[in-house]
């Protein structure tokens, strides 16, 4: 048996709140959880993600250490 009076209170219907709106309910030790970003408004999950870095990391590494010429079309 678990020891009495050492465990935090459990809230099986804790509300997750984003921008003043309840977005889901979960089990937690807090009655309300305020978040700024959740899967419903995160760019990765909504499909509005923007690609900022158009240069590949490998190409940048190879060029930085002189293993790739400036014209990478010859090697592709």
Curated annotation (Swiss-Prot):
Disulfide bond entries: none
Gene3D superfamilies associated with the record: Ribosomal protein L31
One BP term from GO: translation
Database matches in InterPro entries: Ribosomal_bL28/bL31-like_sf, Ribosomal_bL31, Ribosomal_bL31_A, Ribosomal_bL31_sf
Keyword list, A-Z: Ribonucleoprotein, Ribosomal protein, RNA-binding, rRNA-binding
Keyword Ribosomal protein: yes
Any one GO molecular-function label of the UniProt entry: rRNA binding
Any single Gene Ontology cellular-component annotation: ribonucleoprotein complex
Pfam families: Ribosomal_L31 (PF01197)
Subunit structure: Part of the 50S ribosomal subunit.
Role noted for this protein: Binds the 23S rRNA.
Family label: Belongs to the bacterial ribosomal protein bL31 family. Type A subfamily.
The protein's name: Large ribosomal subunit protein bL31
Organism for this UniProt entry: Picosynechococcus sp. (strain ATCC 27264 / PCC 7002 / PR-6) (Agmenellum quadruplicatum)
